[in-house]
Swiss-Prot record:
Domain of life where this protein originates: Bacteria
Enzyme Commission number(s) of this protein: 3.6.1.23
Gene assigned in the entry: dut
Protein name per Swiss-Prot or TrEMBL: Deoxyuridine 5'-triphosphate nucleotidohydrolase
Keywords assigned: Hydrolase, Magnesium, Metal-binding, Nucleotide metabolism
Amino acid sequence: MHALQAKILDPRLGTEFPLPQYATPGSAGLDLRALLKEDTVLEPGQTLLIPTGLSVYIGDPGLAAMILPRSGLGHKHGVVLGNLVGLIDSDYQGELMVSCWNRGNTPFTITIGERIAQLILVPVVQAHFDIVEQFDETQRGTGGFGHSGTR
């Protein structure tokens, strides 16, 4: 398990609301909560930045974090991440904010302390470009967007 430095930016986190934690021993994501001042209605088509009351510092350039949606919010209520995935670089130290987008047809109320997203750690491999005149030929070549078939 990797140690992750964290700052509590909202005093309710860790007292009124639990710190991010894994729901089960097999969980990949730490639940992030909406540390709002009041319950907030997210209208259809609306996107809002929701504070989590937490900042983290990963520190290891071989790791990054991703903020991912919670499947139940998207499937049951149409609430997903406005940026689809939030990428947290290893040297970022600001508050974790969650962009919530209501793609549904009905208003959705985000309640104070509600679990709205999850944070996962992922390995990072940085690359550099080797500029070439042409690539070694492959069977696929430049075919994309369904080129390999549907079955």
